[in-house]
């Protein structure tokens, strides 16, 4: 309590008071002693009160952006369009559809949230022109005009006290105008009075000349996408001949290639592309597979013209009839090896046919060199399958015969489908098309007639206000443009009758106390009204003077002539908007001004604040409800046909003239959703885009029905894999005749993509590939011929799959004709035989003539698997083998990225005007327009009628002192008065 705080000194270990503080009296401070030893810690003091909350901290800095998360699952269709998701990993791109023609713009609505990009659909059918809407209700009256110049100052009254207001006398005749008086002293400007309530609206003036159009305002905010038109009818897609399943291996060796066939004509028009699914998650990269086959190279068609984006995706039309396959074209250059796709589903193993009887042993070669192969013995009857006997001793390897040089045999009948082959090369992805507007979810009703939006008018100069003409139909709401410049002052109109009094202004500053006036005499003669002087500024309010005695009421003076109109004063501040008065009668329309030149488009400014909603217009006539079309039934999903080669893209038609944009019609009622239209004819395929990264392996989908067998195609020979283990020799088939080529089945409708399954386990190894040609002769064996070993065992079951070898050298394309596909042979049933012992490789004999290809014999029972032989030395690479069977249909790949946006195509012909859509909500107030040019002076307005008298205003400030009246001064109680 008034002492010093010694809490900073070390304290002895005694009880603390007041949280360790000691307060001394006001005595003098002693010298500081030596520092003592530190005391023991005291008991903890009581807990202090909680302090006030601290000031809020500064906002933290924005942290670094997190790593990009994985792509989310695809959203459900429908609902409000959401933001565009991150771009997924590209999948295998489908054939791009032909871009539709862009429809007309709909009415501008509120901008929706951007949604997931919809699939690009086919062009909608152009709608019909709508009827113009009814005239909207008359708009509210405009804002009040600016405050006029102040009127002339009144003459100074006498110094007498204010008497009661007498009755108004008759208005005398106006005298001659007096000379203007000398200007009074300029007072200080008082504060601006608040605007009072507005009086009733006066009669409308005559319509002024229209102002000159100002420059075009900035473009408005983009409206929502208009309603999409109904789908066009779908044409029948053309068919392309697809490669059929190849025939089984021929027993004979490959002969000399025949002459190249002429290039066949391409099939029909390609079918339209189905809708693209949502992007899936990225999958693991599959193993690198052998090279796919390169198709026949067709002539490069001219690049098609790009169409505008369609409004919505079309449904896939029914498959067209299969076109006849053209003759095989010249083989193209070998393609680059593609990435190996996911392993396909294992094919059902073929049934093994019964073992044939052994043929006679060939003649031994001369001098150990390979001799010619003897003629094939007649095929014996198939015997019953016996149980495998005991394993005999391994015989010496026989000598291989020389390679024959006979003609190539006719292709045999098709065998069973093998396991799925590796996917072929992916084409180059085409350029990204223009993104069409996101379609609304689901089918929408029949769109109303689309009003054409007029150009934004140029803001005119403010002319002399004329009378209101009949209101026209409400135009689209534009953005507020920049404020226009004030118009030139028009000629002064005739002085109208006195209007109602304005609201009372604020009190002026208080002035000095005035001198008390002497009692006035009774009934002085009224002086003439002087001419109006130049209006002076508003003086400060003086001090309230002593109230004089009430004088007798003077007579009304004669009304003076109206003074000269003073110079216009500065414009007052714009008052608040008054209440709307009653609408006056419509005046005659003034002459229409010449349209101004269109100004340059100004830069887009920020959005203005929303203004008050205008009066609701009359509802437009409700459009007639269209007849609901029958709902189409889904067709039966046909078997998946082979993919045809893409035809050349046709050129787009010439661009038609752009239609004019009409006025916006009234909002039409939303109709019921119409039936889905038929799919339009498919357009030519675009250029295939570059391959995307491989997608993840999907779940195994349901196996689709097997398609009809197509004609045999001949592709490039794939790269040879590593040599597998040699199986035992199977029985030779009986020679048969080549079957007729099978007929191509119709192309099935494209089914919906199946749900991607989890990656399945690795399936069994597929059927063995075609055997390669005989290699170069090996070293000659030494020794006498050994005894013949046991008979060849039945084919064993496949071993585990070997590792993929490096891609081998591609064979060169042959030029022989393609044989016709044979009819599939019957499936044999039986177990597989076991593997026999692998013999030592003998010398290679000369090749004998190729025998005729026999029909496929019935499969024998599968024998017991034999012991695995020792792998022999790797021989030189053989000739390219025959093409294997087409594999099973692979699972659909993930959807690929959209490519980069391509160059915009030429504008197509404008379609007919569609029906008007429903009116969107009112947009925000536009930005203030650019200042327009000064318009011509308007027509002089008519003189208005006298309005009702307003409330009396407050007393004005005291005027300047008047001229002396010839009185005399006298004193009264210390004050001087003048009589």
From Swiss-Prot:
Keyword Secreted on entry: yes
Biased composition (Low complexity): 24-70, 147-176, 222-263, 272-282, 312-331, 363-382, 483-500, 550-594, 601-621, 639-649, 669-679, 725-759, 767-777, 840-855
Lineage of the species this protein comes from: Eukaryota, Metazoa, Chordata, Craniata, Vertebrata
Family statement drawn from the similarity comment of this UniProt entry: Belongs to the fibrillar collagen family.
Residues with PTM 5-hydroxylysine: 99
Record region (Disordered): 1-979
Bias (Pro residues): 949-961
GO terms assigned for molecular function: extracellular matrix structural constituent conferring tensile strength
Changes after translation: Prolines at the third position of the tripeptide repeating unit (G-X-Y) are hydroxylated in some or all of the chains.
Glycan attachment positions: 99
Taxonomic superkingdom: Eukaryota
Protein name: Collagen alpha-2(I) chain
Residues where 4-hydroxyproline is found: 10, 13, 38, 44, 334, 337
A GO biological process held by the record: extracellular matrix organization
Record field: compositional bias (Basic and acidic residues): 622-631, 865-876
Assigned GO CC terms: extracellular matrix; extracellular space
Residue runs in coiled coils: none
UniProt entry keywords in alphabetical sequence: Extracellular matrix, Glycoprotein, Hydroxylation, Secreted
Protein function: Type I collagen is a member of group I collagen (fibrillar forming collagen).
Regions of compositional bias (Gly residues) in chain numbering: 427-436, 517-527, 659-668, 710-724, 778-788
Compartments (UniProt record): Secreted; Secreted, Extracellular space; Secreted, Extracellular space, Extracellular matrix
Expressing tissues: Expressed in bones.
């Amino acid at each position: 309590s008034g002492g010093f705080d010694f809490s900073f000194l070390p304290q002895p270990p005694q009880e603390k008071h007041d949280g360790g503080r000691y307060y001394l009296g006001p005595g003098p401070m002693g010298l500081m002693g030596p520092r003592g030893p530190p005391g023991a810690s005291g008991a903890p003091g009581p807990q202090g009160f909680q302090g006030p909350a601290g000031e809020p901290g500064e906002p933290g800095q924005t942290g670094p952006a997190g790593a990009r998360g994985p792509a989310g699952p695809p959203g459900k269709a429908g609902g409000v369009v959401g933001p565009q998701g991150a771009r997924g990993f590209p999948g295998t791109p489908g054939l791009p559809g032909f871009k539709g023609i862009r429809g007309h713009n709909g009415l501008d609505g509120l901008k929706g949230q951007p949604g997931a990009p919809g699939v690009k659909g086919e062009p909608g059918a152009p709608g019909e022109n709508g009827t113009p809407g009814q005239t909207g209700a008359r708009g509210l009256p405009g804002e009040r005009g600016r405050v006029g110049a102040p009127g002339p100052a009144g003459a100074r009254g006498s110094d007498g006290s204010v008497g009661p207001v007498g009755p108004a006398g008759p208005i005398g005749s106006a005298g001659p105008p007096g000379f203007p008086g000398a200007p009074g002293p300029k007072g200080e400007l008082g504060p601006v009075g608040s605007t009072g309530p507005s009086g009733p609206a006066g009669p409308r003036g005559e319509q002024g000349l229209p102002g000159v159009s100002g420059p075009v305002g900035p473009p408005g905010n983009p409206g929502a996408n208009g309603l999409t038109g109904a789908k066009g009818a779908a044409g029948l897609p053309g068919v392309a001949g697809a490669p059929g399943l190849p025939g089984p291996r021929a027993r004979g060796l490959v002969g000399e290639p025949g002459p190249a066939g002429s290039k066949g004509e391409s099939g029909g028009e390609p079918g339209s592309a189905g809708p693209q699914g949502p992007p899936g998650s990225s999958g693991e990269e599959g193993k690198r597979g052998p090279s796919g086959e390169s198709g026949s190279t067709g002539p490069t068609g001219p690049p098609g013209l790009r169409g505008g984006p369609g409004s919505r995706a079309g449904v896939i039309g029914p498959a067209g009839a299969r076109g006849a396959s053209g003759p095989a074209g010249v083989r193209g250059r070998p393609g680059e090896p593609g990435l190996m796709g996911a392993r396909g589903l294992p094919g059902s193993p073929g049934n093994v046919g019964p073992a044939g009887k052994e043929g006679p042993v060939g003649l031994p070669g001369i001098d150990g060199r390979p001799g010619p192969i003897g003629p094939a013995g007649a095929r014996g009857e198939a015997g019953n399958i016996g149980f495998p006997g005991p394993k005999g001793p391994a015989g010496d390897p026989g000598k291989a015969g020389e390679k024959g040089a006979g003609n190539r045999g006719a292709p045999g009948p098709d065998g069973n489908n093998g396991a799925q082959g590796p996917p072929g090369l992916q084409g180059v992805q085409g350029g990204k098309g223009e993104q069409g507007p996101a379609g609304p979810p689901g089918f929408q009703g029949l769109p109303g007639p689309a009003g054409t939006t007029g150009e934004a008018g140029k803001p005119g100069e403010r002319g002399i206000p004329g009378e209101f003409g009949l209101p026209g139909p409400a135009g689209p709401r534009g953005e507020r443009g920049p404020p226009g410049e004030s118009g030139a002052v028009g000629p002064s109109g005739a002085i109208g009758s006195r209007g109602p009094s304005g609201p009372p202004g604020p009190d002026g500053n208080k002035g000095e106390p005035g001198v008390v006036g002497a009692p006035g005499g009774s009934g002085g003669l009224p002086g003439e009204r002087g001419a109006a002087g130049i209006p002076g500024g508003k003086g400060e309010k003086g001090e309230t003077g002593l109230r004089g005695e009430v004088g007798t009421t003077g007579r009304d003076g004669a009304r003076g002539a109206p003074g000269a109109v003073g110079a216009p004063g500065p414009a007052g501040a714009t008052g608040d908007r008054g209440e709307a008065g009653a609408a006056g009668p419509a005046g005659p329309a003034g002459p229409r001004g010449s349209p101004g030149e269109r100004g340059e488009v100004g830069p887009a400014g920020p959005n203005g604040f929303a203004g008050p909603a205008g009066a609701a217009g009359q509802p437009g006539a409700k459009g007639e409800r269209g007849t609901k079309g029958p709902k189409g039934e889904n067709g039966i999903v046909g078997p998946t046909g082979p993919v045809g080669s893409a035809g050349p893209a046709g050129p787009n038609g010439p661009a038609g003239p752009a239609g004019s944009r009409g006025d916006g019609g009234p909002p039409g009622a939303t109709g019921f959703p119409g039936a889905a239209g038929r799919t339009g004819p498919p357009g030519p395929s675009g250029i295939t885009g570059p391959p995307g990264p491989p997608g993840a392996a999907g779940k195994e989908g349901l196996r689709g029905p097997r398609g009809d067998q197509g004609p045999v195609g001949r592709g490039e020979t794939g790269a040879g894999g590593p040599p597998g283990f040699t199986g035992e020799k199977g029985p030779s088939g009986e020679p048969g005749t080549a079957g007729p080529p099978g007929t191509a089945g119709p192309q099935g409708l494209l089914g919906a993509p199946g749900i991607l399954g989890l990656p399945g386990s690795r399936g069994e190894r597929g059927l063995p590939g075609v055997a390669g040609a005989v290699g170069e002769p090996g070293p000659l064996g030494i020794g006498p011929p050994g005894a013949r070993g046991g008979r060849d065992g039945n084919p064993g079951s496949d071993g585990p799959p070997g590792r993929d070898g490096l891609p081998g050298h591609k064979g060169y394309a042959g030029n022989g004709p393609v044989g016709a596909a044979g009819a599939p042979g019957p499936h044999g049933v039986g177990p597989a035989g076991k593997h026999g012992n692998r013999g030592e490789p003998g010398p290679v004999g000369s090749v004998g003539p190729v025998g005729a290809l026999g029909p496929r014999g019935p499969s024998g029972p599968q024998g017991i698997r034999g012991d695995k032989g020792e792998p022999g030395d790797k021989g030189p690479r053989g000739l390219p083998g025959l093409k294997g069977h087409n594999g099973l249909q692979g699972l659909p790949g993930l959807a690929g990225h959209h490519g980069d946006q391509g160059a915009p195509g030429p504008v197509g012909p404008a379609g007919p005007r569609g029906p008007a859509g429903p009116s969107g909500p009112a947009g925000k107030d536009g930005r203030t327009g650019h200042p327009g040019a000064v318009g011509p002076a308007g027509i002089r307005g008519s003189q208005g009628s006298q309005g009702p008298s307003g409330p009396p205003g407050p007393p004005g400030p005291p005027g300047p002192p008047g001229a002396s009246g010839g009185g005399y001064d006298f004193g009264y109680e210390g004050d001087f008065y003048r009589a």
